[in-house]
Structure formats: C-alpha cells, structure tokens
C-alpha cells in the first residue's frame, strides 16, 4: 500500500491507514440516448443501447463530481465498460407515449478550479423544452449548487448567461457543461430519453 498523502482528508487517511478502500471514482464520461418501442421497458433498453451502456448493471447515484476525477470522452470511457459490470452513474430519464410531445433529459456538471475540491452533477428532465433549454437549466443547477459551497454569492433569478459571467469572474469554477438528449415522442408507442454521467473506478 502506498503512502497516505499528508493533505488527504482525515476520513480518507483513516480508511487507507486501516487497509480499507473508499469507492471513489477516478474518471467519468457523459453519454446519452433515445429509444422508441410499443413497450415502455423496451424503449428504455433501446435508449440505453443508443447511449452504449445497455450491457451494464446500472446503479443510480447522486450527484457529486469527486475531487481529482478526470472527465474523459465517451470513446475513452467505453474502453472500461465490461458486460454485466456494476456501473455507478448519475442518470436522468423521462418517458412518454403522448405522440409528438417534446421531452428532454439532461445531466449538468460544474467542476471547481481547485481539483482537490468536489464538484456537482445535476439530474434534470422536462417536457416542452428543447435540448438547449434543458441543458442550460441542468448546467445552471449544477453551477448554483457548487457556487453555494464555494461562498459565491449569486442571485438565483438572474439568467444563466449572467450567472455564468459571475462564475467566470470569480475564478472558483473552472468548467460547466451538460449532456442532454431531447426527442419528440413517436406515434404508436413509448419514447424514452436518457442522459448519464458514468463513473469509472
């Protein structure tokens, strides 16, 4: 076992010193998908297939981007996926069989400039919103949650563009982003949209 870093949190030092391991993801990637079928379950499976994670046993978790976690591309992340593996992911999903109804699912992400601090992920889903509208909302939610932990004073009623400028000036938040899947429900069945941030250990 390696030397425990002196600046590691006390809880982490205690666990490592006792020979225990904390389940903290080292990497994360974003993915999204959409599926349509006459059966709701099959539409969900097809959405997962479109996202490339249908072979995983997915465990839904919330909503912290771990310290020193690396955000990687989907192509890179898929190299770590193995059929049947227990896969922890922050997921957003919505389903409908109301023909021509617009819907979206989104994961927002806000990462602090100090990599030793944690960031936030938000799950958001909505009807009647475009991909951009849902994505901006999810990103806004994640950034607002992170800002509140960093002591950045913001007006929640400001537009996302105004808040984004405040975050940029504060120099505390290095990156905000989102992954969003929108779709119009197909006639004669169910349509499901899925967005996910998938953790790799």
Predicted regions and their residues:
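Helix-coil modules at protein/domain termini and other flexible surface or pore-lining loops
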Residues: 2-201
């Amino acid at each position: 076992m390696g030397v425990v870093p002196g600046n590691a949190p006390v809880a982490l030092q205690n666990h490592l010193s006792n020979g225990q391991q904390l389940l903290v993801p080292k990497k994360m990637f974003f993915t999204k998908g959409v599926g349509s079928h006459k059966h709701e379950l099959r539409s969900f499976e097809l959405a997962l297939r479109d996202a490339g994670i249908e072979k995983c046993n997915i465990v839904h978790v919330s909503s912290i981007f771990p310290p020193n976690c690396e955000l990687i591309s989907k192509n890179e992340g898929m190299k770590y996926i193995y059929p049947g593996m227990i896969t922890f992911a922050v997921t957003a999903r919505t389903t409908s069989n109301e023909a021509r109804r617009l819907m979206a699912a989104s994961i927002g992400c806000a990462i602090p400039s100090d990599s030793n601090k944690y960031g936030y992920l938000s799950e958001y889903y909505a009807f009647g919103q475009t991909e951009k509208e849902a994505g901006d909302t999810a990103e806004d939610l994640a950034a607002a949650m992170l800002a509140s932990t960093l002591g950045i004073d913001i007006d929640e009623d400001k537009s996302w563009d105004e808040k984004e400028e405040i975050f940029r000036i504060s120099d505390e938040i290095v990156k905000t982003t989102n992954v969003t899947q929108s779709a119009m429900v197909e006639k004669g069945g169910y349509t499901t949209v899925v967005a996910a941030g998938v953790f790799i250990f």
